[in-house]
C-alpha cells in the first residue's frame, strides 16, 4: 500500500507532502524502523514514543504518527487527537481489514479465557472450520505458531496476525480479549461476531485503578458487538446482566446454579475428569470430559454455547465431541512421575487459586496435605498479594517464592504476600527452583503439590534479565532426584 492511499480521508492533520510511495511497515519501536516505515509515537506506561521520533526518521521512517507536532522532523507528520484509535485504523487499512474476512470470536473475563479460547478452537476445528487462535499460550495462524508475551497483541501485530490467517485460508479466529488490551485500543477495528464472558473477579487494579474501571473496560467489548452478533455470558457471575444491558448483540446464557439457556447439573467430579448433564431447550444431554473441576464445567458450557450458536451444529453431536477436548498446557497440568501427584497451574489471582485448591483438596487422600508453591508478579496488582496468602493458607502449607518480579524487588513482593498469613504455616524461599525442590522434598505419598502462577511459561522475568525457566522441567528433575 502507498502512503497517499493509507492516509486518505483519515481524521488527522497532515504536515508535509504526502507522496505515492510504498509503505513497508507500521511500528511503535524506533529500533525496528526501516526505510519506508511509519513510526507510531505513542505515550506509553514507561516511556514516550515522541522522544524517539528523530531516531525513527534517521532509521528511514517516511512518516510519524503522534499527538504532538515536531517542527524539527523532515518527514510527513500525522497529528491526531486520538492516536490510539488512528493507529488501529491505519493498521486495519494497511492489512486490508482482515477481520472482515474472518468470523472472529472474542473471549473475555478474569479467569478461564485461555481454556475457553482453546476449547472453542478445538470444537470449531472438529466442526470443519479452520480456525486461528490469539491467546496467552500462543498464537496459531494456520501453519505458523507464535509465542508472545501479551494476551492481546498490539493493534498493529493483531491486524498482521489476522492477515496471515486470511492468507492461509482460515475462515475463523478465536482470541482472548484482555481488559488492558481493550483499554489500550488493541482490538479497535477488529470486527467481532461473538463474545463470551467467563467471569469477573478483581484483577489488574494496578492498571485500571478500581474494579469499576476494570469492568468498564471489559464492557466496551460487549458494547462493540454488532446487532447480528452473539453475546454469551455466565449468569452465575453477578456482573453478567450489566454486560448484556450495553450490548445490541443477541444474548445467550450459561450457568450451573441459575436458570440459563445452557445449564449443567448432576455434576460428578473425578481425579480423571468429570461428567454432568447439560440442559438445553428442555432436553438433557449427558456430557463426559477429561477436564478436571467445576471451573472447567463452566469453561465447557461457555465453549459449547458459543460454538453451537455460531455454527448451528446439532447439539448432541457437539456435546459428544467434548470427550476429545484436552486442557491447555499449564492448566491443572498433572505430573505423575513420583510417589505423589504434582500439578502445574497458571492460577495467579485469588479466585483462580481458590478454584484450583478446592479441586485438589477433593482429590487428597485421607490425612494428606496440599503443599502450594506460589508467588505474585511484579509491576502488577499489589492488592491481590496478601489475598493470595489467605487463599493458600486456607487450603494447605505454602512455599512463598518469586513469580516474575519484573522491575520490583522480589523480597518486597514476598513481604507484601506474607502480610496475608495469620499462621506460620508457610516457608519463604525467593529462589523459585529451590522452593519447588523443597516442596517436593517435603511431600509424602499422601500429599499433593501444586506449583501455581506461571503455568505454561518457559521464562522468568527479572529487572535486568529474562531467564529460561519452566516449572514443569524443574518439577520433573526434582521428582527424578527422589528416586
Curated annotation (Swiss-Prot):
Gene3D superfamilies: Mur ligase, C-terminal domain, Mur-like, catalytic domain, MurE/MurF, N-terminal domain. Its EC number is 6.3.2.13. It is found in: Cytoplasm. One of its GO terms (cellular component) is cytoplasm. A motif (Meso-diaminopimelate recognition motif) lies at residues 403-406. Keywords: ATP-binding, Cell cycle, Cell division, Cell shape, Cell wall biogenesis/degradation, Cytoplasm, Ligase, Magnesium, Nucleotide-binding, Peptidoglycan synthesis. UDP-N-acetyl-alpha-D-muramoyl-L-alanyl-D-glutamate binds at residues 30, 151-152, 178, 186. Its main location: cytoplasm. The modification N6-carboxylysine is found at residue 218. Pathway: Cell wall biogenesis; peptidoglycan biosynthesis. One of its GO terms (biological process) is regulation of cell shape. InterPro entries: Mur-like_cat_sf (IPR036565), Mur_ligase_C (IPR004101), Mur_ligase_C_dom_sf (IPR036615), Mur_ligase_cen (IPR013221), MurE/MurF_N (IPR035911), UDP-N-AcMur-Glu-dNH2Pim_ligase (IPR005761). Meso-2,6-diaminopimelate binds at residues 380, 403-406, 453, 457. It comes from the Bacteria. It catalyses: UDP-N-acetyl-alpha-D-muramoyl-L-alanyl-D-glutamate + meso-2,6-diaminopimelate + ATP = UDP-N-acetyl-alpha-D-muramoyl-L-alanyl-gamma-D-glutamyl-meso-2,6-diaminopimelate + ADP + phosphate + H(+). The keyword Glycoprotein does not apply. GO terms for molecular function: ATP binding; magnesium ion binding; UDP-N-acetylmuramoylalanyl-D-glutamate-2,6-diaminopimelate ligase activity. Belongs to the MurCDEF family. MurE subfamily. Catalyzes the addition of meso-diaminopimelic acid to the nucleotide precursor UDP-N-acetylmuramoyl-L-alanyl-D-glutamate (UMAG) in the biosynthesis of bacterial cell-wall peptidoglycan. This is UDP-N-acetylmuramoyl-L-alanyl-D-glutamate--2,6-diaminopimelate ligase. The lineage of its organism: Bacteria, Pseudomonadati, Chlamydiota, Chlamydiia, Chlamydiales. The gene is murE.
Amino acid at each position: 500500500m502507498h502512503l497517499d492511499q493509507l492516509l486518505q480521508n483519515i481524521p488527522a492533520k497532515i504536515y508535509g507532502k504526502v507522496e505515492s510511495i510504498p509503505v513497508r511497515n507500521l511500528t511503535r519501536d524506533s529500533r525496528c524502523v526501516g526505510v519506508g516505515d511509519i513510526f507510531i509515537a505513542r505515550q506509553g506506561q514507561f516511556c514516550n514514543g515522541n522522544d524517539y521520533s528523530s531516531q525513527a526518521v534517521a532509521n528511514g521512517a517516511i512518516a510519524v504518527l503522534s499527538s504532538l507536532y515536531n517542527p524539527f522532523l523532515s518527514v510527513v507528520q500525522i497529528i491526531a487527537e486520538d492516536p490510539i484509535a488512528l493507529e488501529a485504523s491505519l493498521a486495519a487499512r494497511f492489512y486490508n481489514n482482515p477481520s472482515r474476512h474472518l468470523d472472529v470470536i472474542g473471549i473475555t473475563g478474569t479467569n478461564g479465557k485461555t481454556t475457553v479460547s482453546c476449547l472453542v478452537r478445538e470444537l470449531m476445528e472438529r466442526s470443519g472450520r479452520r480456525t486461528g487462535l490469539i491467546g496467552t499460550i500462543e498464537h496459531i495462524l494456520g501453519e505458523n505458531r507464535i509465542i508472545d508475551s501479551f494476551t492481546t497483541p498490539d493493534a498493529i501485530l493483531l491486524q498482521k496476525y489476522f492477515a496471515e490467517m486470511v492468507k492461509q485460508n482460515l475462515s475463523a479466529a478465536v482470541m482472548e480479549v484482555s481488559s488492558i488490551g481493550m483499554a489500550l485500543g488493541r482490538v479497535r477495528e477488529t470486527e467481532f461476531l461473538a463474545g463470551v464472558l467467563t467471569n469477573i473477579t478483581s484483577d489488574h487494579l494496578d492498571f485500571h485503578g478500581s474494579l469499576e474501571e476494570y469492568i468498564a473496560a471489559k464492557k466496551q467489548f460487549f458494547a462493540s458487538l454488532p446487532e447480528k452478533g452473539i453475546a454469551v455470558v455466565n449468569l452465575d457471575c453477578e456482573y453478567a446482566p450489566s454486560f448484556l444491558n450495553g450490548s445490541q448483540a443477541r444474548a445467550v446464557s450459561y450457568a450451573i446454579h441459575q436458570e440459563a439457556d445452557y445449564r449443567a447439573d448432576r455434576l460428578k467430579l473425578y481425579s480423571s475428569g468429570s461428567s454432568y448433564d447439560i440442559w438445553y431447550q428442555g432436553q438433557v444431554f449427558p456430557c463426559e470430559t477429561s477436564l478436571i473441576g467445576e471451573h472447567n464445567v463452566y469453561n465447557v458450557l461457555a465453549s459449547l454455547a458459543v460454538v453451537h450458536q455460531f455454527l448451528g451444529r446439532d447439539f448432541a453431536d457437539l456435546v459428544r465431541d467434548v470427550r476429545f477436548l484436552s486442557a491447555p498446557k499449564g492448566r491443572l497440568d498433572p505430573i505423575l512421575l513420583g510417589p505423589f501427584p504434582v500439578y502445574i497451574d497458571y492460577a495467579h489471582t485469588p479466585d483462580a487459586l481458590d478454584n484450583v485448591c478446592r479441586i485438589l483438596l477433593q482429590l487428597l487422600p485421607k490425612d494428606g496435605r496440599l503443599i502450594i508453591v506460589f508467588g505474585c508478579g511484579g509491576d502488577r496488582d499489589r492488592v491481590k498479594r496478601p489475598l493470595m496468602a489467605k487463599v493458600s493458607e486456607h487450603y494447605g502449607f505454602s512455599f512463598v517464592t518469586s513469580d516474575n518480579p519484573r522491575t520490583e524487588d522480589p523480597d518486597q513482593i514476598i513481604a507484601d504476600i506474607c502480610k496475608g498469613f495469620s499462621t506460620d504455616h508457610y516457608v519463604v524461599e525467593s529462589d523459585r527452583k529451590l522452593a519447588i525442590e523443597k516442596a517436593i522434598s517435603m511431600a509424602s505419598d499422601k500429599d499433593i503439590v501444586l506449583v501455581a502462577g506461571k503455568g505454561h511459561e518457559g521464562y522468568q522475568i527479572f529487572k535486568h534479565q529474562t531467564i529460561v525457566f519452566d516449572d514443569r522441567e524443574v518439577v520433573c528433575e526434582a521428582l527424578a532426584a527422589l528416586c
